[in-house]
C-alpha cells in the first residue's frame, strides 16, 4: 500500500510480483507516480478489483507511466481517483480465464479528468471500461484481443481520439453517454 505522496520508479528490469491474491499495489495517497516497473501476480477476485495497480478515491492525480503490467486481472483500476493519468504502459491481461471472468486493461469508476494516453492493451474483457466518470481523455491507445476496445457507460463530456482497435469483438461501445468527441479512431476486425 502506498499511503503517502511519492515516486516509485524502477530501474531497467525491475519486477514487482504479487502473491496471487488481492492487488499488487494499492494507492491511497494523492500525487503518487509509478513508473518503469513490470508488475505481475494480482489475484482473480473481480468484486475486490484485484489489479496490478488499484488507485483509490483518496489518491487523485496519480500517474502510472511506462510500466509493463503483465498477467493481472485488472491492469490499472482508477476507483474514484480524479485527474489521474495512465500513459505509455503495456498492459497484457490474463489469458487463462474465460471472458466473463476476465478484468479490463484500465477500469475507471467515478474518476473525472482521467487521461488514458498511448497505452498498448491486450487480452481481457475490455481495453478501457469507464462508468460514471466525466471529462476524460482516451487518446492514441492500441487495443487487441479484447471484447471491447473502449466501453463507455454513463460518461459525459469526454474525448476519444486517435485510438486503434485490431482483432477485438467490438471496437467502441458508447452507451448512455452524451457530449463526446469521437474522432480519428480506427477499428479493424
Where is each model-derived feature located?
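A generic beta-sheet turn/junction motif
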Residues: 20, 29, 57-59, 71, ...
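Extracellular beta-strand-rich solenoid/capping regions of secreted or surface-exposed proteins
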Residues: 1-7, 16-61, 74-80, 108
Amino acid at each position: 500500500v502506498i499511503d503517502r505522496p511519492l515516486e516509485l520508479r524502477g530501474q531497467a528490469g525491475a519486477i514487482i510480483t504479487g502473491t496471487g491474491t488481492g492487488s499488487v499495489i494499492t494507492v491511497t495517497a494523492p500525487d503518487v507516480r509509478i513508473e518503469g516497473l513490470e508488475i505481475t501476480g494480482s489475484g482473480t477476485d473481480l468484486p475486490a478489483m484485484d489489479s496490478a495497480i488499484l488507485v483509490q478515491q483518496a489518491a487523485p492525480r496519480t500517474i502510472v507511466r511506462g510500466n509493463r503490467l503483465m498477467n493481472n486481472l485488472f491492469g490499472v483500476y482508477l476507483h474514484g481517483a480524479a485527474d489521474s493519468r495512465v500513459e505509455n504502459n503495456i498492459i497484457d491481461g490474463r489469458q487463462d480465464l474465460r471472458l466473463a471472468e476476465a478484468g479490463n486493461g484500465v477500469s475507471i469508476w467515478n474518476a473525472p479528468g482521467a487521461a488514458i494516453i498511448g497505452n498498448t492493451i491486450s487480452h481481457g474483457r475490455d481495453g478501457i471500461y469507464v462508468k460514471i466518470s466525466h471529462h476524460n481523455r482516451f487518446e492514441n491507445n492500441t487495443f487487441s484481443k479484447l471484447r471491447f476496445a473502449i466501453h463507455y457507460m454513463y460518461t459525459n463530456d469526454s474525448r476519444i481520439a486517435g485510438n486503434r482497435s485490431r482483432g477485438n469483438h467490438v471496437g467502441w461501445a458508447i452507451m448512455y453517454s452524451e457530449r463526446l468527441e469521437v474522432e480519428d479512431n480506427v477499428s479493424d476486425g
